[in-house]
């Protein structure tokens, strides 16, 4: 199992493994959410030597970003709504633990609960009323 807490700072090998593994898990997340091909993109930004950079799954309605930016809190996955793939600020930020990348069904449930995106997503009161 991948050690999400091992720092990528000044460790090119760890950073490469972090990006490769995170990208693979985000692909699995897209499949678990039953996202339509072409409705999302996966991006990787390795950034500078002192940081992990980030791997992003950007869907038309959801933005999920993985990085070591919340290590002191244990959080490293940002989930928020967005309005298209040109929206980089989106809705309110929600953070979950990096270790959720080891439990894709649980991560998918969190994404559905926060964004309403994906297979079997809960419908908002507004959608139910329509």
Identify what each model region corresponds to.
Residues 23, 27-30, 105-108, 112-115:
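Residue-level detector of alpha-helical secondary structure
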Residues 1-58, 125:
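Negatively charged, low-complexity tracts enriched in Asp/Glu with abundant Ser/Thr
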Residues 1-3, 117-130:
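Short intrinsically disordered terminal tails
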């Amino acid at each position: 199992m991948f050690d999400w807490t091992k720092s990528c700072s000044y460790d090119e090998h760890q950073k490469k493994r972090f990006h490769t593994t995170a990208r693979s898990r985000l692909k699995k997340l897209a499949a678990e959410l039953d996202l339509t091909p072409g409705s999302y993109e996966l991006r990787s930004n390795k950034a500078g030597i002192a940081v992990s950079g980030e791997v992003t799954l950007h869907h038309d309605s959801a933005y999920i970003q993985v990085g070591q930016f919340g290590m002191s809190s244990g959080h490293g996955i940002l989930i928020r709504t967005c309005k298209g793939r040109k929206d980089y600020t989106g809705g309110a930020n929600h953070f979950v633990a990096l270790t959720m990348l080891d439990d894709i069904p649980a991560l998918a449930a969190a994404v559905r609960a926060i964004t309403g995106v994906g297979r079997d997503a809960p419908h908002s009161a507004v959608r139910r009323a329509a």
